[in-house]
Regions:
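Charged, terminal alpha-helix-loop-beta segments
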Residues: 1-190
């Protein structure tokens, strides 16, 4: 039954992206499917927030990390009202002979684009602004936190293809930017 349900989810996404392209938009269609089926990015992830602003995202993130705050966190930055589509996270134990408690956090922010939008400079810059926001807001940062920003659409343009070319020495398919423990990927649905 689980496999059948997952197969059906993939078929629904295919129909939304390839057959119903003119009618599909990211917020009402693709995002709802991904939000309910974030396993598409890995079984081990947990949904932290969907279509919420960065201030809510930070508070949900602290709850996910089991950081006990007496009052909600606030962010003093006008960009805090930006709303990434999906934010998922996981914690993994890292083998270390000197420290039994060492874990690494992997965080993924997903930005979905309607099938009619070709991913290019404008979409990349939107995700790059999210990356900059996370870097500049110290409460999101730690040496034990890795961040991936994944931009997903039906097609990419030459600008993105050039960014792939620029990052090919890193050995990561779809990678378009890498800074310290932050990476941006531009992926297509196929």
């Amino acid at each position: 039954k689980l496999l059948e349900n997952r197969f059906n989810v993939v078929e629904i996404l295919k129909a939304l992206i390839f057959d119903l392209e003119k009618f599909t938009n990211e917020r009402e269609h693709n995002q709802k499917v991904i939000e309910d089926n974030y396993w598409l990015f890995g079984e081990q992830f947990h949904l932290v927030s969907a279509d919420k602003n960065f201030e809510i995202l930070l508070n949900n993130y602290f709850a996910h990390l089991e950081i006990d705050n007496k009052k909600p966190e606030t962010i003093d930055n006008k960009e805090k009202l930006k709303r990434p589509d999906i934010f998922i996270s996981r914690k993994s134990d890292i083998p270390d002979a000197t420290n039994n408690d060492l874990t690494i956090e992997e965080n993924i922010i997903v930005e979905l684009k309607r099938p009619s939008v070709v991913i290019g400079s404008e979409q990349f810059q939107q995700v790059e602004r999210y990356l900059r926001f996370i870097i500049e807001e110290e409460r999101f940062n730690s040496l034990r936190r890795n961040w991936k920003f994944i931009l997903v659409g039906k097609k990419v343009d030459d600008y993105i293809i050039d960014l792939y070319e620029n990052q090919k020495n890193k050995g990561q398919k779809y990678l378009v930017q890498s800074i310290r423990n932050y990476e941006i990927y531009a992926m297509t649905w196929d």
